[in-house]
Swiss-Prot record:
Keyword list, A-Z: Leucine-rich repeat, Repeat, Ubl conjugation pathway
Family: Belongs to the zyg-11 family.
Swiss-Prot/TrEMBL LRR repeat ranges: 123-146, 203-227, 409-432
Pfam families with a match to the protein in the record: ZER1-like_2nd
Organism superkingdom: Eukaryota
Protein name: Protein zyg-11 homolog A
Described function: Probably acts as a target recruitment subunit in an E3 ubiquitin ligase complex ZYGA-CUL2-elongin BC.
Recorded name of the encoding gene: Zyg11a
């Protein structure tokens, strides 16, 4: 529930009764009040609580006070994670000393001070402690638990007032220590790792050491340290100069978090998922490694998704992750990825564009991800947000290649949106249709029928489908005159069919259809009605069917209307069976446009065209119920 954002004060109330018994609660990033937390969870016999990054409405002292209200929890709580939880000024965490059963305590990224460390060091069962990025200046208090502390994590202790020899003098006495993390932000230039690696007899039982971000860390020094400790199973070397020798790949059973190869990068992304500085570095290494990738790597894509989800407001993480996602989901690679994973990464990309609306490269990466046909056609994601992004890029002129991609994406997404959603895109539609018509006029001036030209016609056709608003903007921007010029300039059937499809959409709008009843337009439609290409003939017939259906257009020229109906009748007679192949029809959104034609019993020619079209769609569409 917490992961999906469904745990709130209201929904948490389902845990207030005694119908269920909770032992573990994992509620990262939730927004709960102190009262709701107390009522929902503190009557349960909890042994593990993870409240990482909960909303500032729920403070660390509130959590501790609530848990302390249960004598059973005070005695039996084994694991408490309060990473990145807010603490009011002048409030300490000394009350943690009441939880005598605690084995594991993590207070990373909180205002945890020396007096708090003194207090928790007295806990009789404490075996694992994480004080990363806290306000601790002196770790000497750890000597109180030197005979029981097995894991110590002190990443980025930026306030530490002890020099490296003084720190090592304390660490040396932690005889039971199996895991030690003294990793640091590289910009701090900490030499603690360098001094540690020189010690021959320190921590002989160590199995895990993290010195990522340390300065002057070399392969030779790390190899020597590990060879003296054969039980070592993990070493963290990201953001250092070590990890590149064959020793690290040859040593059996050793895991390395670093940047030398894909295995090390994967381990780094997994281990450091909550540390943005290391996630960013690991993602940068991953980007470099995947520039020419040919293998499908769903595990890596999942790690990228975790990094994005854990650091939504960190621009370097989001930007680098978006670039990695592109490398991992290029065309054929995307086909091998699970749909749910692709949906997750696509959703995260769109969230990133909303969090950083003015960062162009991030917006561009999100758009580029949609050029994957697998993602665009098969993956469930918010089509509305995608269409909004694509329409905006249609109007950008700094990159013709990207604009062509945006036009192509728009042409596909337009058919995925409901009429209501299209109505919400009014501002984007106005700008995009104007820009699409500008592109067509440019291509006409160049007499160029390239792929951009075809995508643009297709986009206009699909944007105007069952969208009177788009049809209105098309007509207001002299779109009719423009597409008639297209028909005069190009005689290729694929171009003709796209223009006729667009004119069908305009003809379906009663308020606009009368503007198509001009000699120039009618003559052009009649000539295309007799085309040997079935798609062209069919779509030309559709325009005539819609125009002749409304007698109001023909009050002064009923004779011409009669001729058009006769032409329509003869054309349909010459067509093959409605079961014939004609892929253009599968783009119909619904049968709504045929309704006024079917009830027009005074014009059987119009009815016949509508019936032919409906039968064709139903016989060719594998899922006609979706239409």
């Amino acid at each position: 529930m917490a992961w999906q954002g469904k745990l709130t004060d209201r929904t948490a109330s389902i845990f207030q009764g005694k119908q269920m018994s909770l032992k573990l609660i994992n509620i990262p990033r939730v927004k709960l009040s102190a009262a709701a937390f107390t009522k929902a969870f503190c009557h349960h016999k909890l042994i593990e609580v993870n409240a990482t990054s909960v909303d500032s409405e729920l403070l660390a002292p509130d959590i501790i006070h609530a848990l302390q209200s249960s004598a059973w929890i005070q005695k039996n709580l084994q694991c408490l994670v309060l990473d990145s939880v807010s603490i009011p000024p002048n409030s300490g965490l000394v009350a943690l000393s009441h939880f005598t059963g605690l084995h594991t305590l993590s207070v990373a990224n909180v205002s945890f001070c020396n007096e708090d460390l003194v207090s928790v060091s007295q806990l009789p069962n404490l075996g694992s402690l994480d004080i990363s990025n806290t306000l601790v200046t002196n770790i000497s208090a750890l000597l109180s638990c030197k005979n029981r502390l097995r894991s110590l994590t002190m990443h980025y202790l930026k306030c530490l007032a002890m020099n490296s020899p003084q720190v090592l003098a304390v660490i040396r006495q932690l005889k039971c220590l199996l895991h030690l993390d003294i990793s640091d932000h590289q910009q701090l230039r900490s030499d603690l790792a360098f001094y540690l690696l020189q010690q021959k007899d320190i921590l002989p039982n160590l199995t895990s050491l993290d010195i990522s971000g340390g300065t002057d860390v070399t392969d030779q020094a790390v190899e020597s340290f590990l060879q003296h400790r054969p039980a070592m199973r993990f070493v963290g070397l990201l953001y250092t100069d070590a990890g590149y020798s064959d020793f690290f790949t040859a040593k059996q059973g050793l895991k390395v978090a670093g940047g030398a190869n894909m295995s090390q990068i994967s381990e780094a992304l997994s281990r450091y998922r909550n540390r943005s500085c290391f996630v960013k570095e690991a993602l940068f290494r991953l980007f470099t490694e995947t520039l020419s990738l040919r293998a499908v790597l769903p595990v890596m894509l999942k790690l990228v998704a975790i990094g994005m989800r854990n650091h939504p407001l960190d621009l370097p993480v989001q930007f680098t992750a978006s670039a990695c996602a592109l490398n991992l989901t290029r065309q054929e690679l995307a086909r091998g990825m699970p749909v749910r994973l692709l949906a997750e990464i696509t959703d995260l990309l769109f969230k990133a564009t909303k969090n950083f609306p003015y960062y162009q490269q991030l917006q561009k990466n999100c758009l580029l991800s949609l050029t994957s046909s697998r993602i665009l056609m098969d993956v469930p994601f918010d089509r509305f947000d995608a269409a909004k992004l694509a329409l905006r890029w249609v109007c950008r002129r700094e990159s013709p290649k990207l604009r062509t991609m945006a036009v192509s994406i728009t042409s596909i997404l337009a058919l995925k949106l409901s009429p209501e959603e299209m109505g919400q895109l009014q501002e984007e539609l106005i700008m995009a249709i104007k820009e699409l018509l500008t592109i067509i006029r440019q291509k006409l001036a160049e007499n160029l029928d390239d792929v951009t030209f075809l995508f643009t016609l297709k986009a206009l056709w699909n944007l105007t489908d069952e969208c009177p608003l788009a049809c209105k903007y098309f007509m207001e921007n002299e779109g009719l005159a423009t597409v008639i010029r297209v028909l005069e300039t190009f005689s290729i059937s694929v171009i003709q069919s796209k223009v006729l499809g667009l004119l069908n959409n305009v003809a379906e709008v009663r308020e606009l259809s009368s503007k198509l009843v001009t000699e120039d337009v009618i003559e052009r439609i009649i000539s295309l009605l007799h085309s040997s290409n079935l798609e062209v003939s069919f779509l030309a017939a559709g325009v005539l069917a819609h125009l002749t259906c409304d007698r109001q257009h023909w009050l002064s020229r009923d004779l011409q209307r009669t001729d058009l109906l006769r032409y329509l009748h003869l054309a349909i007679q010459n067509w093959p069976s409605s079961r014939c192949d004609m892929s253009v029809l599968v783009t119909y959104r619904s049968f709504k446009a045929f309704s006024p034609l079917l009830v027009n019993f005074s014009q059987p020619e119009v009815q016949r065209w509508a019936l032919w079209a409906i039968h064709h769609v139903c016989s060719k569409n594998p899922r006609p119920k979706d239409v």
